[in-house]
Amino acid sequence: MATTYRICPRSGLQFDTEAEKLMRWHAVAGVLSLLVGGIMALGVILTRWPAVKLLPADTFYMVLTAHGIDMLIFWIIFFEMAVLIFASSTLLHCRLATPKLAWLSSWLMVLGAIMTNVAIFQGESSVMFTSYVPMQAKPHFYLGLILFAVGALINCFIFLGTLVVAKAEKTYEGSIPLVTFGALTACIIAIFTIASGAIILIPTFFWSIGYIREIDSLMYRVVWWGLGHSSQQINVSAHVAIWYAIAAIVFGAKPMSEKVSRTAYFLYILFLQLASAHHILSDPGLSSEWKIVNTSYFMYFAVLASMIHGMTVPGAIEQAQRLKGYNKGLFEWLRKAPWGNPAFSSMFLSLIGFGFLGGISGVMMGAEQLNMLIHNTIYVPGHFHATVVIGTTLAFMGLTYFLVPVLFKRELMFPGYAKLFPYLFGLSMYMVALVMMGAGTLGVSRRHWDMAFAGSGMAYEWPGAAYLMMGLTGIFGVIAVVSGGLWILQIVFSILLGKKLEEGETRSTPIPLTLPAPTTGSHVHPPATPGTMVLALIFLTAFILYYFVNWKYLSSLWGLA
């Protein structure tokens, strides 16, 4: 089949028509997974809300299992596969490598997702997202995850193959664009992640059908977190790439320093997946030396990388705005930003929430001693709702507002809600993350369906503040789920019923990518970014204060005299 290319008249982007179909396929599969996970989230929220306690224990753990897997694995990775295709074939103006194999891998992912969900909803695989042994799920639970992982792994290699095609056919000159470099980082981490999953899930599958007698539980936890937490590091690389992409789309912003941003991505490859260690700091099978090295020296390099991105993205926006004349004071560039554009507002709320809530709490959780304060409490899901929901999901949702007219060729319906959505969903998730972390600091359990332990022989009375925070988790969680559900309806209605837009020119050969020539001349200087510097100092101040408060809290609980 001859390759054809569509030139989008609204964005100027060039799509390999087969790659375009695959992007739509993955985006739709991701949104369907988000729908299932969101419905399950409502059940989780209304059960953990002490005044409601909706579901009985067995149903709650089934719902919690589906929520975790559909949100943290299926929704995120489906969308990331669309991002990989976009960042390679579209941004590099080339054909997709092996489209038939790409379709096969995509079908494997869908089949795996369906198989695992069927196993969960049959009610005998309520092992939760972590699926720790010796808890055993049905064989098709593990088989579904394996098929999904194989499909995703094939897609990763197709992405790498597409980069080779672009280089061989000379569709671009020089280095790949920064967004593509970010996607390459995500791909490399994904290969490590999926390999970790295969190493542990394949023998666990054989254990579930009786071919292997037992799986060592400590070994399982160590290897599984190479999948469980590293899959979230794919998210970080992908959503940071989306931050850069939206900054370029909305403002025409250019990175403050390509070399610095690429170096930060390289630090992700070397050190980011080591953050998995904070999940197993209480495990006896690992040496103190290993724990200390991974949760201090190595992890700090990954933190440094995120702080670099957290400064260069708003810095690039500030430079672009100041070049347009928004130079009054420290923050006119930010005040005059297009806050009514949902792509921008989603991205900026994602950036702030990921840094201040997810980043700071993640470093605190990753410190071996401080981890004892919140290990296995509801602080942990509070942290990853700040990273995965606010950081990743909100960024993906913001990009979708750009993709509806460009990729799906439909006019967005309900534009008024689009302006409201980032604030309704984003700020409610800010509150969910904050009050979850507050309740976790008071010791509320991470997963127990009834925080009051009703009927227990050793009941425990929590302080009133803990019940208040769990109640607020319920209130703001419902707001977030409802607003997210309305977003899904808006996107589905737009794709199915929105006004059809002009498709654009179709060509049989790609137009080579031409990057703007670098500006020469000693008289040209990018504008200073004092506003970004102030934001960075505010972040560092909050970081230091929160770190100090937690060490002070630990010292009050763990007296040495």
Language-model features: where?
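Juxtamembrane cytosolic/matrix-side boundary and N-terminal portion
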Residues: 521-540
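Final/C-terminal transmembrane alpha-helix of multipass membrane proteins
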Residues: 348, 427, 534-550
